[in-house]
Amino acid sequence: FTWQGELQGRADGRFTYRVHGEASAPFLRNRLGLCVLHPIRETAGQPAVLEHVDGTIVPTSFPDEIDPGMPFMQMRALSHEVAPGLRATVRMTGETFETEDHRNWSDASYKHYCTPISLPFPVAVEPGDVIEQEISLTLSGSESRVAASTSPDEPMTITISDREVPMPGLGIQLDTDGHVLSPDEITRLRALHLNHVRVTVTPRHSPADLERMLVQTHAIGAPTLVVLDGADPGAFMSFHGDLRIREWLAFDAQVKVADPRRVRFAEQVLGAMVGGGTYLYFTELNRARPAASDLMAFSVNPQVHASDDQSVMQNAMTQGVIARNARDLYPDSRLVISPITLRPRFNPNATMPELDVSSTPLPSRVDARQCLPFAAAWTALSIKAIAESGCIDAVTYFEATGWEGLMERTGGSPQPKDFASTPGEPFPVYHLLAALAGATTVRPCMSSEPDAVDALIVDGTAFVINATEQAQSVLIAGRTVDLDPYAIVTIPVGGPA
């Protein structure tokens, strides 16, 4: 399949993107064409006008709460006000488009895509088949009535509120590849004063395997969250009432949401709090709405759809929206996000997982940025979004060591060219969690330019975050803070007035 694209901008405020493609060999497709993203921060809950493919025009609005389905269908055009006196219209031709609320997967966007999911797929594409699509963006209105939100000469600012919310408990995963922690690694992890350590038990694991995991979590000094990933709860009855285990999750990776009957059975045989929810994303909870358990869980990663630096950073803010929506669904449950990872752990929608190969030189679960300041900055933004929501009880971040962890192992990276870590070194994200050890309260704050700089305010200390690859300066608590790319700078800001 070969294609050509054409971009055209006109003085009258119209921007057009055209694509022409032709198949030279047969293949199967799910979707093939253009996508349009509307940003969440500027459009959530805002009124819009939708034009359908049959020409009918209806008033509507961008969803405020996360929509589990498709909020806009049979789309030809969508228009909304972007500033007083200025209106934007996106027109889509060549296919039938519809919209997903991408916040379900923690993206900071609504996505307009083709082909509609309701149509059969995959679709056979034959040699000579032509695909032509056009997306146009038209701005209309009185330019004189539109004022810039900030002047380029004005400094970026962060304003701290007097409100306080509890810090959720922060935990990690024990390494899922079976790595046994060294004494030095255990010492470092003990210094984090973790709320919990997550371990995963599959049908391949025996009670002796779980005991070996518990020896490590006990050495770290943190309670254990045990995930039964398809394992029979009855096989682990010997751990009934084990004080090293705070709670269990009864999942089956072959089923998108936990069966409440399985959760109740596990509670009976294990004598502890057992939770349900989903092994996957908030999407599954939002769509299936399983019955509440005392503990409900779901996972998050920012790269279900896009992996560029800017998208990943922007997606962190959506975790706060997810947290609030999850609390609305389960007002009385203990809510845990577990785990949060940089990359997807697997593709739950792959019909042939063996063909779902990595898009980088590293395994698909591994992100080369894990050992860089980027991961620490992103994690600080993630903690900010979740903590400020006041809706989540605990969060599991990453693994203990290695490619998906907080520190490099003494043997170093298996692919040092692609994952440029130093053997035995703690990653910047470790230092962030160490600085947050024992944290109790968070004060929400607001940045004038949150895509560039933001802050996490914890127990009288501001963790000022640069979310970009450029140096930035920001005014906070009466002082100017200069930040290197993806840097975190801490300053004292005191408590509420």
Language-model features, listed with the residues they occupy:
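Carbohydrate-binding surface patches
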Residues: S447-A477, Y486
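Aromatic-lined substrate-binding rim segments of carbohydrate-active enzymes
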Residues: V201-F239, V257-M273, Q314-A316
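Noncatalytic carbohydrate-binding groove/subsite architecture in carbohydrate-active enzymes
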Residues: A250-P373
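Extended, loop-rich substrate-binding clefts of extracytoplasmic carbohydrate-active enzymes
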Residues: F1-S24, D101, S106-S109
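Beta-strand-rich recognition/accessory modules
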Residues: S79-P155
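Aromatic/acidic polysaccharide-binding cleft in carbohydrate-active enzymes
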Residues: G128, S338-P428
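Polysaccharide-binding surfaces and accessory modules of carbohydrate-active proteins
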Residues: D12-E95
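Catalytic domains of carbohydrate-active enzymes, especially glycoside hydrolases
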Residues: L170-L225, L243
